[in-house]
Amino acid sequence: PAGVSVSDILFPLDAVKDFSHIILVEGLFDVLKLHELGYTNSLCIFGTQNFTPIKAKILDEYGCRKVTILMDGDNAGKQASQKIQKLLEQRNIETVTVTLPKDLDPGDFNEEAAEYFLGKLKENF
């Protein structure tokens, strides 16, 4: 819609309204892959520069109490993880950061990779 910035959008926000634990990923293909693998509590932030205080507020208002930060394994992903963690902790939302190897992103996950990086978290969803 006109006047809406990608910086204001979390996708697919309505799909996670019943979860108190959310997984945040960078891109659309990342979130689609995680949903395909059964991690339906995942949201896309549309790029490392696009997590804002507005998005932290939205998650807080949706009742999110814990966030797993799952950015790509590159430097931009690592820097974004730190920024996201600070913004969420200002709203008293617990965070866990999963650090991926340099050349891996969640969109590349198969079932084994998802289980390796996220399996221990799934029981808390």
Predicted regions located by residue number:
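Phosphate-handling DNA/RNA-contact segment within nucleic-acid enzymes
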Residues: 1-66, 80-81
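Replication-associated primase and helicase/ATPase modules
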Residues: 23-24, 60, 65-70, 81-125
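Short, acidic/turn-prone active-site loops that include or flank metal/cofactor-
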Residues: 46-51, 72-73, 101
